Each structure stands twice: as C-alpha cells, then as structure tokens.
Design a protein with these regions (language model features):
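Non-catalytic nucleic-acid-binding interfaces of large nucleic-acid enzymes and RNP effectors
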Residues: 1-271
Length: 271
C-alpha cells in the first residue's frame, strides 16, 4: 500500500468532514431532514430561511432572551420589529418555548448526541497529517481542499505579507506526546471556586465547558495520533503581523498543558 497516498486521502477526508461540520450549515441541515418542521413553518407563514436559522441558533444557545436572538438574525430583515414578529410566529407555531416570567426563549429541539460529538470534534480546523500546500496568496491556508484568509478575523486585505514565513512554519513536523496527555491533567484557571460576583449557574457552565473541551481534545488527539506519527499546524497573521497557529484543540500557543503535549518530530539536543 502506498502510505503517502493513504495519508493524502486521510487528510482530504478530515477536511471534507470539517467542511460538512461548519456549525450553522450542519445544524440547519439536521432540521431540514425533518419534513414536519417545514410543514409547520409553511402553515404559520414562517419563511424557511428564517425558520431554519432561528431553530439552529436556539439549538446552539439552548436558551436566550429575545434581544440576543434578534441580533443574531438581523441579517434577515432591516426592521428589528419584523424579526420580533417572526419570533412570535415561531412561538405560536410551537417551534420554541417562551417563559414569560423569565423573559427567555428555550429550545424545544436538542441535537442528537452523535451530531453534537461530531460537531465538537470537526467544527474547527484540525491539524494536517500531510505537509500543507505552499501558500501563494493571502486567500490560501495550506489546506488541500479549502481556502480562507491568512489574516485573522475580519482583517483580510490583498497587501503583501510574508508568505515565506508562513510556508516555513507550516512545514515544521510536530508530534503528540500521548504519555503526557494521559499522565498530566489538563486544567483551566479558576475552576476550583466561583469568581467574585459569579453566579453558581455561571460557575457550573465554566466547569462544564472545560469538561467538554477536554474530552473532545483527547478524542481529537487520538484521531491525529492514529492517522500519522507526525502532524502539521497551519498559521496566519493578525492585523499587526503577529503569527498564530490555527488550532482549537491542538495548539502550541495554548495553556501549559497544550504546550507540553506537543513536541518537534525531529528533535536534537540544544547546546
């Protein structure tokens, strides 16, 4: 078997799964599989685009006040009152629960456990198991199947940036120290007690967020380690020209644990 071709296909499959799991696209696609939901929206004159967006946002947020949802859906209508009117229609259609005493909307539709786990693993770009493509313009990222921006956030421009540096750091071979992942416990700061002014509910949310991140990170690391004995991280600039590696679960610019589990594939003793 040609190992290089196998790794290439593995990398393409990882990228295809990532593209499929772009957050809003994937969540909306789950709702679009249910014909009953479309029938309800049509019956109550709820535009499908708005309805699916609304359901996806509610599934992700679980509960939210109307102001928050209006802000998230503002691209559908120029008039904020129109968005409120459509949300009221969704309440009448029983697509969401409204608790008048708390003034909050609560989702009626939970994502399945399998879908949620796949989203957790693949909604962010993963490390590459083959060398990244050479980037030749600001719209490339090094990934085989998808472009993007080499300038982070909403700061894209066509001006010259140092592509040579990006290509150089993109091709550094890295590996995971799986013994460290098992023997050293990952932790975030201030999870042992509530912050000043923090509610018990918010404290619990922070702990739950860490548990979810940590569990998913270990699964992603196992996936990458099984695919190849080395991996590559892609990089981009911020608007001030500082270099950041792309990676949510695996990132050598993270906390102490994130740094400790990543090593150079080709090591040498520093004199």
């Amino acid at each position: 078997m040609d190992t290089s071709n196998t790794l290439l296909e593995t990398q393409k499959e990882i990228e295809r799964i990532f593209n499929k799991n772009q957050l809003m696209f994937r969540v909306k696609s789950e709702f679009k599989k249910e014909p009953e939901i479309k029938e309800i929206m049509d019956k109550f004159n709820i535009p499908n685009d708005f309805g699916y967006d609304f359901l996806a946002q509610m599934a992700l947020h679980k509960r939210a006040n109307i102001q928050t949802i209006v802000g998230l859906l503002r691209h559908h209508y120029d008039n904020g009152q129109m968005i409120v009117n459509m949300i009221v229609q969704c309440i009448h259609a029983d697509l969401v629960d409204w608790f008048d005493d708390l003034r909050v909307l609560v989702t009626k539709f939970e994502l399945s456990k399998d879908v949620q786990e796949e989203l957790d693993k693949f909604q962010f770009p993963l490390p590459m198991v083959v060398p990244p493509k050479k980037v030749q313009c600001n719209r490339e990222t090094g990934y085989l199947l998808s472009g993007g921006s080499l300038i982070l956030k909403n700061n894209y421009h066509e001006d010259d940036i140092c592509l040579d540096h990006i290509n150089r750091v993109n091709r550094i071979q890295l590996k995971l120290n799986m013994d460290t992942t098992k023997m050293v416990k990952n932790q975030w700061r201030n999870l042992d007690k509530q912050k000043i002014g923090e509610t018990w509910e918010d404290f619990q949310k922070r702990n739950k967020a860490f548990d979810k991140y940590n569990s998913t990170t270990l699964k992603v690391m196992e996936l990458i380690d099984q695919a190849n004995d080395c991996f590559y991280l892609t990089h981009a600039y911020d608007k001030r020209g500082r270099t950041y590696c792309r990676g949510y679960h695996i990132n050598y610019q993270g906390n102490e644990w994130n740094k400790a589990v990543i090593e150079f594939k080709n090591q040498e003793i520093a004199q």
